[in-house]
Design a protein with these regions (language model features):
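Short, solvent-exposed amphipathic alpha-helical segments in soluble enzyme
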Residues: 1-3, 26-28, 59-61, 151-159, ...
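Short beta-alpha connecting loops at secondary-structure transitions
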Residues: 63-70, 217-221, 279-280
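Short helix-terminating capping/connector loops at secondary-structure junctions
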Residues: 2-5, 36-40, 130-131, 162-163, ...
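Hydrophobic/aromatic beta-strand patches that form the interior of the parallel beta-sheet core
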Residues: 10, 44-46, 63-65, 138, ...
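Acidic catalytic cores of enzymes that act on phosphate-bearing nucleotides/polynucleotides
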Residues: 91-95, 105-236
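C-terminal amphipathic alpha-helical interaction region
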Residues: 278-300
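Glycine-rich phosphate-binding loops that contact phosphosugars or nucleotide phosphates
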Residues: 1-110, 293
């Protein structure tokens, strides 16, 4: 800000009273107020209508983006809470929505062969019936890690209730092949896996250094990074198949707004279908308030 850069503070809380959000906002607002008397011009509030946060924003004529009351946080990626920060970051939100819209059409197809969400939900549910209660999203691209963490929240909050649930795990290839795969291959067979791989990641040829260094792993000679990662991915799947470990596979053409939008929509519909099969409500989170109430009691 002092160097002439534009600053925008986006305060996001669906309820308008999330402890951590209010705490962090107070710290940042105080710093912003030190820099300019017109601090309110640099703040945007995203919250549901009628919240205390909305009342405060109206008091200072702060811009407000309303988040629908009937859309939970984990499902709100295509609402202002999700798309406004993405737009600020330069993401093409129209392409994101385009991918989601195309996928939604597929997910409403009554023919299971053409419906990826129904196929995946059925596979996960069948695994649950075989007493496999854990679902590992194994993402073979570092850039998808945050998508994995979103999936973890989506699964846990939507499906973990009434004494039922699926425990979500998130793994990153190839990083977690060096930390978790021993457990996955030889531990208890209680994990269902969704492999997510990307076709086109922008290939890099592996250079030659010198004869001595090149001989350390001679198989890498004249290879590309993509070809090596593809071999690692296929080798991982082969190990799963040899041990008869259950999995499904999702292949993204590339990491793009349209592909990510489609994937997010696919997982949300899959979760709704799973909730229906499990006979639970996919859209509430009745027990989350317990820790919030306890926190406020301790703060008082």
């Amino acid at each position: 800000f002092k160097e002439g850069n534009t600053v925008l503070l986006n305060i996001i809380s669906k309820s308008g009273s999330t402890n951590e959000t209010v705490m962090n906002s107070k710290v940042l607002l105080k710093e912003l107020q030190k820099l300019t008397n017109d601090w309110a011009q640099y703040v945007v509030v995203t919250t549901q209508p009628g919240s205390k946060l909305e009342d405060w924003a109206q008091e200072y004529d702060i811009s407000i983006l309303p988040n629908p009351k009937n859309v939970g946080g984990r499902y709100s990626v295509f609402c202002p809470v999700g798309i406004f920060p993405l737009a600020l970051a330069g993401i093409d939100i129209l392409k994101l929505h385009k991918g989601a819209s195309k996928m939604l059409v597929k997910c409403f197809d009554e023919d299971v062969e053409n419906n990826p969400a129904l196929q995946s939900a059925t596979a996960v549910y069948r695994a649950m019936q075989r007493e496999i209660p854990m679902h590992n999203m194994f993402l073979f691209d570092q850039d998808l890690e945050r998508v994995g963490k979103w999936f973890r929240q989506l699964t846990a909050e939507s499906l973990g209730k009434d004494g039922k649930g699926i425990t979500p795990l998130v793994s990153i290839g190839s990083t977690d092949l060096h930390s978790m795969v021993q457990l996955y291959l030889s531990g208890s067979k209680n994990i269902f896996t969704t492999f997510v791989n990307v076709k086109n990641t922008g290939d890099i040829n592996i250079p030659s250094i010198d004869s001595q260094f090149d001989e350390i792993v001679p198989e890498l000679e004249k290879m590309s990074v993509d070809s090596v990662m593809d071999a690692i991915y296929k080798g991982t799947k082969e190990s799963y198949e040899n041990r008869e470990l259950p999995y499904v596979e999702v292949i993204l053409d590339k990491i793009s707004e349209e592909e990510i939008g489609a994937f997010l929509q696919f997982k949300m519909v899959e979760t709704m279908l799973l909730a229906n099969l499990m006979d639970i409500n996919a859209f509430d989170q009745p027990n989350v308030e317990e820790y919030k109430k306890a926190t406020r009691r301790l703060l008082n």
